[in-house]
Every structure is written in C-alpha cells, then in structure tokens.
Amino acid sequence: TENIIIDHCSFSWSMEENVTMYDNKYTTMQWCILSEPLYVSKHDKGARGYGAQWGGEHSTFHHNLFAHCVGRTPLVNGARDKSASGHDAFVDTEIINNVHFNWGNKGALYGGQLHSIVEGAYSRTNLINNYYKPGPATNTFQDRWFADCSHDASSATGLGEWYIDGNMFETNEYKNDKNKGDHSKVNANNWIYADENNSKKAVNLRAGIDKINEIKLTAPSAN
C-alpha cells in the first residue's frame, strides 16, 4: 500500500493497538486521536491497551494526540521484515509535534530496531517537538523517558539511527521521579541522560544535528 493520508480520524477501544501499520510506503497520519484502547478485553495475552504500531517506509506521524494508552505511543516498527525480498527495509520515520497524555508505562515510545537482512537496510527515526504530559495512570517510576531506543535491540541485525530534539516533558507534574518533577535539563537537551555506551542499545548510533538533512524524508511526503 502506498501514498496514503489519514487525516482527522479517531481510533479507540482496540484489543491490542488502536492503529497498526506495516508493509506500507509514503504514509502520513495527521491530526488524529488515538485513545482508550481496552486494557483488559479478550486478547489471549491478557492485559494490553496500546496506542499504535507505526511502520512502513517513508512515513510521517504528526499533530496527533495519544491519550490514556498503556504504552506504544507509538511502537516504531523499524526495519523489521527478515525475508530477502521483504518490505519495510529502508525506513525513514518522522514523529513530530504529537501530544502524549497519561501513558501507563515509564517509556511512552520505543522501537526503531533494524532486523532486516536486505542489503543496505536501515531504520532512521526523527523524534522532534513532541509534548509529554503524565496523567493519573502514568506510573511514577524512578526514571521516565521519551523513547526506549534499545528495545529488543540485542536480537537486531544492526543499529537504528535516531534524531531526537525539541521534545518536552511537562515539568513539576510529579515530584517522586528521578528528577523530582524538574525536567528542565532533559527538555533543554533531550540526549542528556541517554545511554550511548552499551553496544546492544540502538541509541548507540545516534544521528546528530549535522545529519538531520540526510535522514529527513527524501521521497514525496503525503502531507
């Protein structure tokens, strides 16, 4: 599936993710609401309640609202297809200007792995200018982060690349996390607490400000 825009839609009450996308190309989701997935329904894995699984080659996810999801806001699929002729091998993902409210886990977003065996495959994610506001269901863990770039990376075939900048946590919302509710440092520099020293972590290969033009979408965007 190619050349798709999903605009001004609402998605709720799913048993797993409210929206799941993969094997797609040139896709934009904009100005949508993804909220209230069912936490305990009839899923054979038990409690779920996720926002979205976002995949495909050359995709943009902007100006959307995630509300009242346990996690996966979104799960970034990355380059996941392990067949030699597989799709989703050359992945550029933009996640920009979204609002994340009242997620349940300590990490609102994760993924971006590189699992494809296609020669030259890559997974590049731009996470820019998103706003994170904890709510009543947000667990008050010691740590809280924008993105778990290392998720499942120990089984990956290579490292994903991330450009992360301009994302903002609501400050002073909760006083008992690692930063005592003061997120001014990480708001000023989203990489300040990043672990870049573990070879199993996808964040080990990060795309700096000098590479932003290289990893932006070069294919025609749908928005």
Question: For each predicted feature, which ranges?
Answer:
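Right-handed parallel beta-helix
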Residues: 2-13, 25-44, 50-76, 80-105, ...
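Extracellular beta-rich repeat passengers
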Residues: 75, 89-223
